[in-house]
Amino acid sequence: MATASRPSSAGKFEIESGDDFVLTGLTSITSATFTGLLTGNASVGEVRVEIYRVFPNDSDTMRTPNVPTRANSPSDVEFDDRDSASGNLNFMTSDLGMSSVLNSVQPGGIHGCPCPPAPTTGGDGSLTGEEVAFDVNFTTPFVLPADHYFFVPQVEVTDPAGNFFWLSAPRPIVPPGTPFPMGFTDLQSWTRDEMLAPDWLRVGGDIVGGSPAPTFNAVFSLTGTPVPEPASLSLLALALTGLGAVRVRRRHR
């Protein structure tokens, strides 16, 4: 599975795809990696990273959602962000060669309710592109308190016909991925476009569908250091979880 994720740009509406991670203490996030497919001429413009908390944080709970559920989704609005255009993020790319996936969520493939039949489409089918690993350095680190978050990377492809598609990873997490700490659940990947916002859809449960519906994680890692809390004499233990160690190539779904 691969899901589109891009900032808005000339002739292209915004699409966001997110997967979750947990911090058990105040943490400075200094870098990240993620992997996806580039289509078109694979020329990268802006790279943006957003952090969301879990609904109902940062959300309007009085409105009626236009999706089957908001439980365990990202919030309505982002908690924090960094982007290369603002100079608080820089990045390098590594070309991993051509790759294909059996299913995808492409621009125009995200639909809200009424339900049924929307939003279930079964996905938008197979996709081939240049597999690229992104190494991102946050020149202004994210300083995040203990909480459950979603990581949302977006890549602008300057070719009008091109896009970035974030690759999936197994769910439940398998080695060398980092398991979630006790008391926290590994949530599945979610996505939305600017027409669906502020709502989100589950990539597997809502868009692909089926009985049972598949669930997906995404390929990413985060690097950070614990930050002393005020009046604390020792560093808190850092638990950076999610797909923190998933950096190897695999046969994608």
Predicted regions and their residues:
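A sequence-level detector for low-complexity, Ser/Thr- and acidic-rich stretches
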Residues: 13, 33, 39-41
